[in-house]
Amino acid sequence: DLLLAGCTDELDAKNETYKVFECAGAVETVVFANRIIETKQYDCVVVIGAIIKGDTDHYEYVCQYVTNGISTLSATHSLPIIFGILTTQNEELAYERAAIDRMNKGKEFAETALFMINAFNKL
């Protein structure tokens, strides 16, 4: 999982503490993130994954549901939730955004999480 590796490598490089959970699929990330937030144990949640377009309209519905769900959770709980779900037209585009030797978005998700935690701590 290249996105996860990019994210955890960056957090490890900064000596940050984190916990990794796995979820069944993109749609389930919304309720899973909500449950993580409800534990009140974490300063931030980074949701990582990929939704790749297929031949049906399902892609559009999943993208919309997950995007709306995650943004609603973040606003409702006043907790940073980093939207680390790639939404691409094909696997090649997803790989380009996840490859460690290129612009690994996982690293960017970790950087954003650390920035937001720091910003919230200043409030």
Question: What spans do the regions from the language model cover?
Answer:
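Glycine-rich phosphate/diphosphate-binding loop of Rossmann-like nucleotide-binding domains
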Residues: 1-24
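Glycine-rich oxoanion-binding loops at beta->alpha junctions
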Residues: 21-39, 86, 91
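Glycine-rich phosphate-binding loop
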Residues: 28-70
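Short, acidic/small-residue loops that bind anionic groups at enzyme active sites
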Residues: 60-87
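Phosphate-binding/catalytic loops
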Residues: 89-103
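A charged, well-structured terminal subsegment
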Residues: 103-123
